[in-house]
């Protein structure tokens, strides 16, 4: 059966990762959470007290500490920096609030995009992020751009944080998400924007299963051509 590349882009907490994981599992494809890679880079930068002025040092850290993925017995995706499991630390608020400036560093993006493209070249893949359809996989057969209201996305992040034992303030999350939207869409390198041939889908008020079904139907039509 023909295998394709599925690119899912969108702003923070638009449902990208949740949807992408399910689709990858259903199709037997590789799932790559590119956001986790940038979070891992941010985690490294913060651990070493680096700032936006330290781009070269951050890239050096990435050269010396490989970012890789594993799978827990319950199916949860694990993220490693070197041999250290950073799955949960990279989801903490400090990382979340700093990932935009780290991911805007051209040398960091260049290194991680090259790694993402290497992984994608190995076969069927579902990849989610902010520049997958425009930069990482511009040739992807299916490109989806997910959006949702700031209020709904803040509510999702609020519930997710509480479930992981991370303190959360709903109003503050709304402010942080709106601020991150602005930063991500206005950065000079690979800004958040839909690919010209992406299918837009507003997930506000729509369940995950409906979003998955919509994307899988589009994918099957391409595969069956």
UniProtKB/Swiss-Prot annotation:
GO biological processes: nucleobase-containing small molecule interconversion; pyrimidine nucleotide metabolic process
Pfam families linked to this entry: Cytidylate_kin (PF02224)
UniProt key word Cell cycle: no
Catalytic reaction equation(s): CMP + ATP = CDP + ADP; dCMP + ATP = dCDP + ADP
Keyword Cytoplasm: yes
Gene Ontology molecular-function annotations: ATP binding; CMP kinase activity; dCMP kinase activity
InterPro entries, alphabetized: Cytidylate_kin, Cytidylate_kinase_dom, P-loop_NTPase
Residues the entry annotates as binding ATP: 10-18
The protein's Enzyme Commission number: 2.7.4.25
UniProt-annotated location(s): Cytoplasm
HAMAP family referenced in this protein's UniProt entry, alphabetically: Cytidyl_kinase_type1
Family in the record: Belongs to the cytidylate kinase family. Type 1 subfamily.
The protein, known as: Cytidylate kinase
Source species of the chain: Streptococcus sanguinis (strain SK36)
